[in-house]
Amino acid sequence: MRDMAQIRNIVVLSGAGISAESGLRTFRADDGLWEDHRVEDVATPEAFRRDPDLVQRFYDERRASIMAAQPNAAHRALARLDREWPAELLIVTQNIDDLHERAGAARVLHMHGEGLSAWCSACDARHHWTGTLRDEPPCPACGARALRPDIVWFGEMPYRMDEIFAALARADLFVSIGTSGAVYPAAGFVQQAKSCGARTLELNLERSQGSHGFDETRLGPASERVPEWVEDALGGRPC
């Protein structure tokens, strides 16, 4: 990979692997939630219409898990990069937790929604939410009992794609951390960035399905590989 001195704009994509080390289980990992619930039962609009109580209970549990988790060394390293990187940096996360923000990162975009947010299908308002949704509480904005988890379910369009593609077009470096490379559109970001001239780096516990598309892959736990890379990016100063 070329000298980081030539890199200005960076897009980081973070996936399940970065939060797994904080104890948050995912659909895609071997110990993931899919072992307990089929995706079709808890993560689709059809599932919510069919059994809203099950879906609300499922995300109430996810919300509690998020609040109990703590950022790890990878989150803290990216927060440091966010503070100290002098040019454009965008952290695009597939995760619904707030561990990037709690570690101190500000330039974060949640393409799949946020576990600590509720969306009202009646008035389109979004609210920070730490309690339960199972008992159908009223929307604080309009009073309708139409709140659901502010999550992008399978079959729905990810959030803020225009902003993501614009950032990828400007990127000099695209870094993917802890992703499976199996879920689109995020799995296509590496090719999108490369087509616009960016260099590409994968940091992952094991090679993803899209590893062949990266200029470089560094394998190992995110809590080790990410601080190492951030140290390199910031000129060798230890995290």
Q: Where are the predicted features?
A:
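Conserved catalytic core of sirtuin-type NAD+-dependent deacylases
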Residues: 1-239
